[in-house]
Structures are given as C-alpha cells and as structure tokens.
C-alpha cells in the first residue's frame, strides 16, 4: 500500500491532505497546471475526514472545483483499497491514464491501480477459439491463433500454424489476442462500435462457465480480477458497479474485489443505472442470441454427440425460434393497437377496464409503454409456449451422451441432470442450458407481473422488442447492495442539491445518514457567459412551439456563428426543427443518430462553426473545451415524461404515500438534468459563451423561479442583440 510522504507535524490523514493542497505543497510544486483552489482543498479535507471516521458524505462540487484530484489524493494516501466509480468510461480512462500517473509523480507515492470495465468490453478466449475453429474449416485465408489450453499452462497463448481464417476481422482479432495484455476492445481503435462479430466474442456473464473453462487462468476477466485484488485503487463505472452487485450472489460471484472505501463520482447518474441493472428483461435479441450460440455449440459437438441428442438439439432450437417469433410479434402487434387507440383519443388508462396503462397524452412514449397484467394475460398462451420451448433447449443441452456412451435412464429433470452430470469438455453445452433456464425463469416472472415493487412495460427499439420489469424504488437496493459495501463512501457530482438541499438525492439513493458539503463553481459566470431567455414563446405543449423554437434557434446561431449544442427533450422536436435549421444556416449541422456518439463529438470538435442537434445522451458526460462550443440551447425544461413507465410508476408510488410527486420528484429531477445540460458550456476558466432556454415556463409558472435559482449566476437578457455584443467584447 502507499507510503504517506513525510510531512512534518502532520499525523492525521486530513492534515496530510491539507498540506498536499497548500499553496506551496507537493501538487503546486510538481504539477505545472495546478492552481490552488479553496474549494478543492476544502473538499479534499472533507473526503479525508470521511475516510478516517467512516460513514457517508454527499459533496456537490461545482464545475471547475477540481473534484477528481480532491478525492483521489486522500484515496491514495488512505492506506486502504479504494474503489472509484464513474458515470462514464471517458472519466475512468482520464483517471487511470492521466490523473493517477500525475499524482504518483507529484506525491512521491508508490501505489497500484486497475481500471475495470464491464465484461462485454473484454475478449473471451473460449469463444474466440470456437469461432476460429468454425472459420478455419470453411476456407483458407489468414492464419489465426489457437489459444490457451489447460489450467496448467503458463499463460502464453501460442499459434497453430495450420489454421487459416477467411474473415479478415476475425483474423485481426485473433492476431491481437496473441499480443494484448488486457483483452480490452478499446485497444482495437479501428473496430466498428456496433460490429456484430464482437457480440460473438465478448466475455459476457451469460456465456461464462467460470472455473470450468479450459482458458480460466488465461482469461482476461480472471486476470483483471486478480490485478484488481492486488491494487490500491480500483476504477470502475456505475454500470459495472451495479452489474457486479446484481450478480454477487450468483454462482460466479463478483468481479470487483472488496474495498474499504468507495468514491462514487457523477453520483446523480446512479439511480438510472441501478434501475437498469436491478431489473429483469427478456427480448427477442436475448432469445435469438441464445439460439445462435446454441447452434454454434451444437455444431462444434455434432461429431461427438449421439445422433438422437444432435437431432433433439436442432429441433429444440427451431421450436424456440418459432415460439419466440410468435410471442414477440404478438407483443408488437398489441403495442401498435394501443398506439392506434391512443391516436383515436382512447387513453387506455389503468382502472378504466382497458389493457394498457399509458396516459392519454402519451407523446414521446412510443418506445416504452407500461403494461398491466391483463394485457400480458392476452399473450399468456404464447408466453407459456415460449417458456416451454426454453425448457426444451435447457433439457437438450443438459443431455450430454456421446455416440459411444451407453443410454442413460430416462425421466430425469433438467435440474437433476445439472447436479448429476458435470462431464469434462461439455461446459459450453451446460452454459447454454443454464442460460435457457435463466431466460425461462425471467419470462415467467414477467408474465406473472404480480410483484408490486416492480413496474412492467414493453420497450421497442429498432427491431428489438423488450419485455421489462424495473424496480420502482432503488434506494433500498442501492443502500444495501452498493453503499453498505464500504466502511466509508463519498458521493459527489457537480449537481446533487436542489434549492440548497440534498434531500432529493439522499432519498433517491438511500444515502442517509450522510454529511453534506456544497462548493460553488470556481468560474466567473458574470464574465464568462450570458443567459438568453426569449421575450415571447408559445406554450411548449402548443403545436406552434416547434416553429417558434426553430426561428429562435436560427437567430441565436447566426449571432454565435454556429459553435453550438442544441439540446432537445425529444426526438420529435429535434426532427421538427432540423429541416428549418439546415435550410436557414450554412454552418455544418450534425445530428444525433447519424453516427456513433464518439464520432459525432470528434466531428464537432474538429469542424469549424459546427452545430450539433442532440437529445438525452449529449446532456451530460460531454466535454468540448474552447471556442468550438460557444453556445448551448435547450428547447424545453427537461421534465421526465409522465407517459414513461418508470416515471409514471414512481409518481404513483409517491402519491400513494401522500407525497407531492411534482415537487418531490419531477421538479428536482428536471432541475438536475437542466443543470447538466447547460453545464456542457463552461468547462474551463477561459471558456466563454451563451446559454439559452427557450421554454417560457421559466417566467410564466410558479416553479420557474426554482429553476432560475438553480442556473449559473449569469447576466440574463431577452435581447438577441446582446448575444452579438457579448461576442464582440
């Protein structure tokens, strides 16, 4: 573990940390760009005190505070293993590749660190070998490696000179597998983000057979876990943190090692991530992926399997495909019928005797529709047939007789075979059986739809149809499965409080009791920005709003010369405004959905005067420094749609316990979201620009003052000419 540098007169961790951030302290001497900031120093000392005494602290550190160093320094000097969880992979990599090496040099401290991502980011050697075996038999081509082998191997992956691959991408990955130390797909910079082949190669938990795998010792997940268990600082993201907590009780256990202390950065994102990972979902994609991989396993074992076993497997897979197609098509047709009914004015409200529980004003809910048990009952027969088909696949892949083996007694259930049969070399088949059983159990839970702690809904995305159940409240889950793991935990973000109170975030995350610290931004918003609010705009719910918003956006962008993010609360509004903006302006217009997020950001940074039209995924976790981003426009106050299933369920839950959902949930959530969106503009002391919110409710509604009070303390104007004068300074 790290050795605290000798600092005379300093004994407690907080005293050491305070001296590290002093005007002439180690950071000031060693880091050329370091500027002593009172807020950063105060936060660092508060974090140190929390680590020393235990418990929890909520720290809101305004943009420019330097919160990353403020928690990393006490974490490094604490002499305990510390977990740092971030909202994005970008921040993970910044900490691992930039901040920690700089601190190691500045502090003169020796420590080790591991950056851990979700399993799907890593290559599975077993799946690679299976793919190479299948590819090498098809034709001659590029040589591919034959990797890994028994647990007694030294860990060196060798090549089989007799194997060649026809697929150049597979050959490239196979070649890379021989050289990489991490197996992280991020090393393959030229690999398309949405490449289907990676889905067949990723080390997902669903396909993992754990210590039964012949590549277990060479496995990149195993090696990452071992590195982390020997590290002083473990860096993860919220997705891995919650996914790991969700599977901790499974037979494969957790990936993240035990850590004494935890730091959860970008903590405002944790509720949404927890809602996703502590829920249940069955989709046509999940079932089709099972069928696809079951076919691969069946093909690889066809020569060894008894003929009746091979036939049973093929029939079970085809039966599963047929029933999955019927079930998910039925759900899709039901969704379309409900959408038609809403368009005709029938709201299908819960309690009205209708099947669907979507509000009448369901605009924006086209992708997620809340379901009732009555609707699922209409699809129960198809659902039960699908569950039985999954049972057939489970049984077929637990059947492991070879052509030379004696017949086994009939009548054993799948679970009995699971316990009695663990034949060497059949781990892939057993993994397929296990997955089929898990999907069957999840499907039956979803079809029952009886747990009052969950909200049930149908989600469609592209060609995907997802039947989901999400926890209505995650506070208890987050507290028990995440926060209580640590002796001390720090939750921090630039946006945690509403109207000076942490009550909202504390309640949503179960973070009580907890100390509090709120630090203002280090930026001078009075000089760095202005806030433009249009003098007159239609009601956002009016059909006239889109045209008026497009006109205002064009007027603003003409004065800023592009260089802007225009953030929308819905794709519908983006699509309505896009043609007007493209026709009126000569600036390059980039639109979310036309390319990968990372590619769009890179284009924006490198294209002079660019304008990006985007929705939710660009409201946070995006940094563009300098003049390239000189304006951020928000079309409407970002209230979560009451038609969203999870939102509506949470509104109902608050109302049932006698609360006021609008003020307790909808307003605080919208304020934090708006702060994040507008926070994209000023990221450094030299940044300047214009903020604009087009929604007239900031001035016409009583709650508007609550929003205005939460915005950066910038001069407010309703004059478009003031924008031109601002940039003329």
Language-model segments: which ranges?
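A substrate-engagement module of RecA-like helicase motors
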Residues: 1-30, 63, 80-82, 86-139, ...
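Walker A/P-loop NTP-binding motif
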Residues: 48-49, 68-81, 98-102
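Walker A/P-loop
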Residues: 52-71
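Signature of the SF2 helicase/ATPase Hel1-core->accessory helical subdomain module
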Residues: 77, 93, 205-207, 211-388, ...
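Conserved RecA-like ASCE P-loop NTPase motor core of nucleic-acid helicases/translocases
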Residues: 82-88, 490-492, 563-569, 692-694
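A contiguous, basic/glycine-rich beta-loop/short-helix subdomain that forms a polymer-engagement track
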Residues: 198-234, 242-253, 386, 393-408, ...
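Conserved RecA-like P-loop NTPase helicase motor core
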Residues: 534-544, 594-698
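Conserved helicase motor "Helicase C" RecA-like lobe of SF1/SF2 P-loop NTPases
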Residues: 569-593
